[in-house]
């Protein structure tokens, strides 16, 4: 479920790969993904959990993966 905090059109393949690494390889929580993205790309959302979830959903979908299945969740 998305919360409209991220416009999927703004997520590049490079950003999606970085988000995937944080979530899937480094086991970041949605809050940690949100904070890392805010720090790296500049966002006022900070560690907002809904923002982190939306980033993961947008990234997974761009990569052709299901954001609610392994390895995302």
Language model feature labels by segment:
Residues 1-16, 69-73:
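Basic, amphipathic alpha-helix used for nucleic-acid engagement in HTH/winged-helix/SANT-Myb modules
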Residues 38-59:
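Short, basic interhelical loop/turn and adjoining N-cap
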Residues 11-28:
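Short, amphipathic alpha-helical "recognition" segments used to contact nucleic acids or chromatin
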Residues 6, 11, 28, 45-46, ...:
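Short coil/turn linker and secondary-structure boundary residues
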């Amino acid at each position: 479920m998305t919360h409209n905090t991220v416009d999927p059109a703004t997520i590049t393949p490079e950003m999606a790969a970085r988000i995937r690494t944080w979530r899937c390889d480094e086991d970041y929580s949605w809050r940690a993904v949100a904070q890392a993205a805010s720090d790296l790309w500049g966002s006022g959302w900070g560690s907002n959990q809904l923002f982190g979830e939306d980033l993961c959903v947008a990234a997974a979908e761009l990569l052709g993966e299901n954001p609610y299945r392994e390895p995302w969740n």
